Structure formats: C-alpha cells, structure tokens
Amino acid sequence: MPLYEGLGSGGEKTAVVIDLGEAFTKCGFAGETGPRCIIPSVIKKAGMPKPIKVVQYNINTEELYSYLKEFIHILYFRHLLVNPRDRRVVVIESVLCPSHFRETLTRVLFKYFEVPSVLLAPSHLMALLTLGINSAMVLDCGYRESLVLPIYEGIPVLNCWGALPLGGKALHKELETQLLEQCTVDTGAAKEQSLPSVMGSIPEGVLEDIKVRTCFVSDLTRGLKIQAAKFNIDGNTERPSPPPNVDYPLDGEKILHVLGSIRDSVVEILFEQDNEEKSVATLILDSLMQCPIDTRKQLAENLVIIGGTSMLPGFLHRLLAEIRYLVEKPKYKKTLGTKTFRIHTPPAKANCVAWLGGAIFGALQDILGSRSVSKEYYNQTGRIPDWCSLNNPPLEMVFDVGKSQPPLMKRAFSTEK
C-alpha cells in the first residue's frame, strides 16, 4: 500500500485496481507505479486435469459467478491481503465485454465481497491517462483479439471501433501447428523423434514460453518475402535465410528442436492479409477512415499500442512500417487525408498500461467517488449502467449519495488545467 496512506482526501483508503484479462490478471492499488501481482486468469478445481479459465463468455451465469468468486477471493486474500469492504474497486474492462459478464462480476463484488463502490473503466481510455493526452488511436493487442478504438477529446468514438481475432491465442495455435508438423524431440530413449509421437498436444504454458523466448517479428522487407514464400503463388519464391535453431528443454528429460524458420514465421499471421484484406495494420487504417476527416491527422499522430502481444520484439517497428506501406496503396492514398503516423511510448510495459491508467484514475478520490457505482444504488436496483443500454437511469441516481453531480465525461477524463 502507498506510503502515508491516511493522508489522502478524508483519510479514505486507496482503491483496488483490477485488470481482468483473458490470459493474465493485473491487480494492485491505486497510486502505485505497477501492479502487486500478475497472475494467470485461471483457478484450479479438485478432480479437474486442467486449470479453468475465469474469463469465459459462453458459460451459464451461476457457473461464471462461482469461478469469479473463487478467483477474486485469491486476489484479495492471497495477493493483496486487504479487507474488500474497506476499499473502492476500479475494474479495467474491454468496451466489447458482454453485459452478462460485467453484471456477474459486479454482483460478485457487491453481494459477496461487499465493496463500497465499483468503477468499470474502458481499457483504451485508461491508457491515455498514462500519457496525459486527450486524443489517440488506441490498439489493444491482447490474448483473444486485437481491438482498436479512437479516443477524441476524452470521448471514445464507439462507432469507429474495429476488431480481429488476432492475438496471443492465434499465435499459440499457429505455433503448435508448426511445431507438431516440423519439429523433432530428443528423449533418453532415442534422438530426433517426431513431436506428435512423443506428445499429442503442447500445453498452453509451454507454447507461451516458447513464443516469448524464441519468436520475434521480422522487418517489413523480410516479412513480405516470408509471406511470399509461404504462399508461393508463382512457384519460384525463395524464403530468406532463417535464424538459428533453438533447443528448448521439455520437462527436464526431452529436448525440443525449434526450427529457425518457425521463430520468425509464426508472428506473420498478424500481418498477413486475409481474404478480406484485413490485418492488424489495416485495423488502424480502417478505423481512421471511419473517423471524421478533421480528427484523422491528430489521431494518426497519436497511436498508442497496448496489450501483451505487442511486446514481441520488433512488433512496433513492423506495425509502423506496415502502416506506412499500406497508406500508399490506392484504397487509402486518396481518401485518408494524412500520411504521418507516430507511436507513443507509455511509461509502463504494454501489458500494464491500462492497469496504470486505472491506478492513476483511482488515486483521484473525489472524481472516483463521483464516477463509481455505489453499493447503496446497486442494492436498491440490482443493476449497473451500461453504455450499450438505452434504459440507463439518470446519473444522479447512480453515483455516491452526498457527492456532487459528476462532471461531464470530457472534463472527467481531460488532462487540461
């Protein structure tokens, strides 16, 4: 907990900030520079061979409730070591988070843990607080998908978002496919056995470790050559010389030979255009095309990239090169209206930027109180405001009793003096 905690506004204890990601959860306290813990978003059940993912959108509500209850209990009483009744909660969420998941999560926090208030904060908006800017094009490359959302003058431009199922999960699937097809394993019994004969599938944790330790993103010229050789339409395209092979130890007894050609080709699926000519780079350009023309220049010059997948070596350099390459094509050249693109460097690792923004916002105790859903309101109504609902109650009914009416959204998230 921060030093001099009792000297805040009215001596109120600092808020708990939770970024509940599909692969990893970041958790800590407002006002701190980094999360106290980054743990896999899973729980272990007796009799279950594999850990159970907590963030699931296709299971029934009661099952989800029990998973979230157990997982948040672990956060509070194994990692944070604080009483949940004493502290407000800031939850970092995706704007595409299904309503039933948000409602189940808030039910767990209010009914089971009895927290004083909950603020559900969009991850893209929170990322801007770390940079002190009002307008940016924010791309979140996470585990399940890559999601882009423009923020202009502190307001998310919701009709210009874009998403593709390109993230850590897609990389793991591609990596596993290539490893099983091409790689060999040395065991105590024999050398260079085919991987499928030794193990039918590769655990998710091993795939992630191989990805992080060995894979990287090639530059644009090399990447285009790798893609051309992969599809080999004209039949005479040569692949660039691969990087060195890597020997990866499996469970202390086996050695997996990871081919160099796999190390640089796996990540190309993020930049290969599919049948609809979509990739991570076109996500940004297509979103920009949907924005009002007088906002495009400012948004293009303020790109913010967050999410764990964007931490791969060479990712940002390649993304910027792809954008500058694509913007010269006829589809964008005549209509986009700008050719200058710049990427910000946030003051935290890409996977923790949204959490840090939530920690900054959670430290503003007066504003936090005026923007949070209070326990009293939730107990009366059993519901929370939802941006995609047309049946939201008046603002003065939602926020803490005794607090002044909340400022306009623009002012609440503005960094202007």
Swiss-Prot record:
One of its GO terms (cellular component) is dynactin complex. Pfam families: Actin. Its main location: cytoplasm. InterPro entries: Actin (IPR004000), ATPase_NBD (IPR043129). SMART domains: ACTIN. Subunit of dynactin, a multiprotein complex part of a tripartite complex with dynein and a adapter, such as BICDL1, BICD2 or HOOK3. The dynactin complex is built around ACTR1A/ACTB filament and consists of an actin-related filament composed of a shoulder domain, a pointed end and a barbed end. Its length is defined by its flexible shoulder domain. The soulder is composed of 2 DCTN1 subunits, 4 DCTN2 and 2 DCTN3. The 4 DCNT2 (via N-terminus) bind the ACTR1A filament and act as molecular rulers to determine the length. The pointed end is important for binding dynein-dynactin cargo adapters. Belongs to the actin family. This is Actin-related protein 10.
